[in-house]
């Protein structure tokens, strides 16, 4: 999970990509919500905001704009 705009968002489905990067862990590195983590990249596919139904990443991004270079906690 991660926190964004004071809301907890659970990652329900994701894919790990083994890729070198120079970003700080937790940094959003694409407009499709790919997140730098350790020695790879987490590509989020499905998530759920607190008190809301689960959404595909496409559905989520239609209503929420998480900008590239945002660092998630």
Curated annotation (Swiss-Prot):
Pfam families membership: Formyl_trans_C
Record's keyword terms, sorted: Protein biosynthesis, Transferase
Reactions listed under catalytic activity: L-methionyl-tRNA(fMet) + (6R)-10-formyltetrahydrofolate = N-formyl-L-methionyl-tRNA(fMet) + (6S)-5,6,7,8-tetrahydrofolate + H(+)
Function, as annotated: Attaches a formyl group to the free amino group of methionyl-tRNA(fMet). The formyl group appears to play a dual role in the initiator identity of N-formylmethionyl-tRNA by promoting its recognition by IF2 and preventing the misappropriation of this tRNA by the elongation apparatus.
Transferase found in the keyword field: yes
Gene behind this protein: fmt
GO MF annotations, alphabetized: methionyl-tRNA formyltransferase activity
Source species taxonomy: Bacteria, Pseudomonadati, Pseudomonadota, Alphaproteobacteria, Rickettsiales
Entry's EC annotation: 2.1.2.9
Top enzyme class: transferase
Organism: Rickettsia rickettsii
UniProt xrefs under InterPro entries: Formyl_trans_C (IPR005793), Formyl_trans_C_sf (IPR037022), Formyl_transferase-like_C_sf (IPR011034), Met-tRNA-FMT_C (IPR044135)
Record-stated family: Belongs to the Fmt family.
Domain of life: Bacteria
Name of the protein in its database record: Methionyl-tRNA formyltransferase
